[in-house]
Amino acid sequence: MSEQSSSRYQQLQNEEEPGENPQASTDAPPPYSSIAGESSGLFDYKDELGFPKPPSYNVATSLPSYDEAERTKAEATIPLVPGRDDDFVARDDFDDADQLRIGNDGIFMLTFFMAFLFNWIGFFLSFCLTSSAAGRYGAISGFGLSLIKWILIVRFSTYFPGYFDGQYWLWWVFLVLGFLLFLRGFINYAKVRKMPDNFSTLPRTRVLFIY
């Protein structure tokens, strides 16, 4: 009886196991050697696409140092013409310092009469004591008119006989010289006096007066 039961409960062979083994073998990853052989062409293709490669030793050693790179960067940030931005600041009018350098009509008339009445002494005093354009141009103009005055006095006075006898060209030279000095001082002051109106809307300008 026991033998019949043992034969009845014999272990059956699993029929699914042989089928799972081929599937497991197909799911296993391929060996590394086969992957390396198949993908070597792909890696070579990526290199040919232009990916950056490290520079050679010669190129790496020829690169600028850190100090040179910083110096180049600092030079690039420096403007080509330094200090020019201050020269282009718009101005509404001349300031007080510019007005003192130009002067006014009162200074011009004062130095004019000083040079005219006191001749060359008044000219040197008024020219050296004043630093404005009006004062110096007034001194020049007054000295020119004073020179004309003395030429006429010497020419037509009976107290100085024989000064221009036979030398009338010298009389004309001094007369023309005095007239030119008078006109130069008067005309130049008239031009300088109009500068505040002409330069009021222009950028800041440095003006050099040549007397």
Curated annotation (Swiss-Prot):
Pfam families xref list: NEDD4_Bsd2
Gene Ontology cellular-component terms listed: Golgi membrane
Topological domains annotated Cytoplasmic: 1-106, 155-162
Keyword Membrane in annotation: yes
Disordered: region residues: 1-48
Protein's job: May play a role in Golgi structure maintenance.
Protein name per its UniProtKB record: NEDD4 family-interacting protein 1
Species: Xenopus tropicalis (Western clawed frog)
Gene name of the encoded protein: ndfip1
